[in-house]
Amino acid sequence: MTQQTMSFQAEVKQLLHLMIHSLYSNKEIFLRELVSNASDAADKLRFEALENNALYESDPNLRIRLSFDKAARTITIDDNGIGMSRDEAIANLGTIARSGTKEFFSKLSGDQQKDAALIGQFGVGFYSGFIVADRITVETRRAGLPASEGVRWESAGEGDFQVDTIERAARGTTITLHLREGEDELLSSYRLKSIVQKYSDHVALPILMKKEEWDQEKGEMVEKDEDETINQASALWTRAKSEVTDEQYKQFYQHVAHDHQDPLAWTHNRVEGRSEYTQLLFVPSHAPFDLWNRDYRGGLKLYVKRVFIMDDAEQLLPQYLRFIKGVVDSSDLPLNVSREILQESRDVKAIREGVTKRALSMLEELANAEDDAGKEKYKTFWSAFGQVLKEGVGEDHANRERVAKLLRFASTHGDTDAQDVALADYVARMKPEQTKIYYVTADTWQAAKNSPHLEVFRKKGVEVLLLTDRVDEWMLSFLHEFDGKPLASVARGDLDLGALNDDEKKAQEETGEAMKPVVDKMKETLGEKVKDVRVTFRLTDSPSCLVADDNDMSGYLQRMLKAAGQSAPSFQPILEINPEHPLVKALKADGADFGDWCHLLFDQALLAEGGALEDPASFVKRTNALLLSRAA
């Protein structure tokens, strides 16, 4: 049998049904698609009229008109663009996935393509009208053809259509949607305006509707003869920065972010190269109430050639920058056929990287401001979004160092809970012999400030960062060093604050040897509660403290995981005792109440670091017994 090449067969009725009811997730999209087609028709006329001005037919003011008829249950979209001939109507409307725009675009020269702002590329947008209509009537005449060569195209979306030649004086296209049952809510001026303003507000053509006014006698809105433009018909981001005032940027932010307050900062630029796009990004001055909700949708508004595609385009910004508001307008982003989903590609990745770098540059300018007003702005930003930005240390490996420079913490340098210390500030204040950046984590600033682990640091004048945000422990698992200086927890491992002289070293060794019987007996008494017991010289005022081994999870992180309902490995801390404290000095390994004192020192250390006692009743009973024995 000889090999044959065959064409796939398609049941057109089924294909139309599948496309109409499966391609689009939101029925409002039909108006965006039809307005986009009308905009393309105007652009085509402009280009052809460059060589033949007579195509304007004494009507050079291009526009789109939107109207509805409640009695007839129809919505009409009318444009005075290029229009279609009979053959074009049959080819473009009668062939699924044929794009007249795409074919027209392919005929343009390179320079003309760069200047064109044509939107359609799939040839399926027209059929979105069948989402809300059970019949569509199109009347059209191509510019330059006589009125006798008008065309009427009509279909019920069932796999066939009818075409007639009609008399049509007006150039352009009129699309009438005969609505399905249950779609009457669209027969409202307010409803249609809201859809246009959501999706097509920045289409270059004015979109006109008849004005409505309240009629007191009839008790309803009545249509007037006067037209009104219902879209902005311009996109602020397409203008040069020098042409836009600060007040206009602020007003646009309030419009796009639905926020009544001014932004802290903004950045506006056009990127040219393999991926061409314009970005206008804003930093809000306050966090939305639902920023930490599981369902919070962050991201930018995505436009393609000034037509709104989607809110919350999460693919264009990493999660830790979800608070950034603004728009990205691209001319060549890959979308799926319904233009509702952004497809992953090298272009999307390049735009994401570019937008991320631009957003970080904007934050760096805020953070590095020298004037008081600029510093105050960054304080406001950090208070609102600092915890979110910390997520970037773990999420964005490529920009980790840039994000780290933007971080701010409270520290022992100032006696306030203000998070205003940058890591660079800390490094600049380090002692000559200091090799590490020290920090302590706790539930609250008060608990961190009063942690017994800080005692020796205060004595030696070494600054310690006070970390109290829930994200800090997770962040530190990714941030191991800054400017070549390792970050070290004051509550983990052995403490090394610099070299000791021979006399100090000998004294500590002798003290440790003398305390060995007590330490061994404490290990035996506390058993599984502790991983080890050892003498420490990090304490000056407290009798004991708990530390984690170098490779173990900290007690604070374990408590945080439990509070979040997650499983955490069992925590065995190391109990360190201060040999110079009177309570420790009074311990005798053979004393009758030695066990009670051991448990009391452990429980006190646990409470001091913000932990919770497993058996509070026993702690109270033991404490009372020891107090009574001392009183006696």
From Swiss-Prot:
Entry's localization field: Cytoplasm
Record-level Gene Ontology MF annotations: ATP binding; ATP hydrolysis activity; ATP-dependent protein folding chaperone; unfolded protein binding
Gene Ontology CC entries for this record: cytoplasm
Keywords of the record: ATP-binding, Chaperone, Cytoplasm, Nucleotide-binding, Stress response
SUPFAM superfamilies for this protein: ATPase domain of HSP90 chaperone/DNA topoisomerase II/histidine kinase, HSP90 C-terminal domain, Ribosomal protein S5 domain 2-like
InterPro entries: HATPase_C_sf, Heat_shock_protein_90_CS, HSP90_C, Hsp90_fam, Hsp90_N, Ribosomal_Su5_D2-typ_SF
One Pfam family matching this protein: HATPase_c_3
Annotated stretches, region: B: 340-559
Residue ranges that the Swiss-Prot or TrEMBL entry lists as coiled coil: none
Annotated region described as A, given as residue ranges: 1-339
Record PROSITE patterns: HSP90 (PS00298)
C, as annotated region: 560-632
Principal location: cytoplasm
Quaternary structure and partners: Homodimer.
NCBIfam families: PRK05218.1
Role, per record: Molecular chaperone. Has ATPase activity.
Family to which the UniProt record says this protein belongs: Belongs to the heat shock protein 90 family.
Record-given protein name: Chaperone protein HtpG
Gene: htpG
